[in-house]
Amino acid sequence: MESKALLKHSRVSPQKTRLLADQVRSKRIAEALRMLNLLGTKRARIIAKVLNSAVANAMNTGMMDVDNLYVKSIQIDEGPTMKRFRPRAQGKANRIIKRTSHIAVVLEEL
């Protein structure tokens, strides 16, 4: 049986977040959360938040043993981008792209 959690429009870069998600994939929940807490970055806190939400979903269904959960899949998709402009010299402007991410986590029991 699976437990899922989804976070949309998170203000972190999908490209950088995927590097962290690759480290967590296929690990047990306790080990994954321990690793994310040691990193302490914004991306790590956001992924840990989604993992904790998936664990809470598993507990609420009541059919899963929380100690035997592992990260079956974690998917980082690109959300909508926010476009901003930064003034430059001689009346010009550069475009700043602020990226967002959609994070989907699926946990499964061993």
Q: Model-derived features: where do they sit?
A:
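C-terminal structural segments of small proteins and small subunits
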Residues: T81-R99, I103
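Ribosome large-subunit tunnel/peptidyl-transferase-proximal elements
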Residues: M1-I76, K98-L110
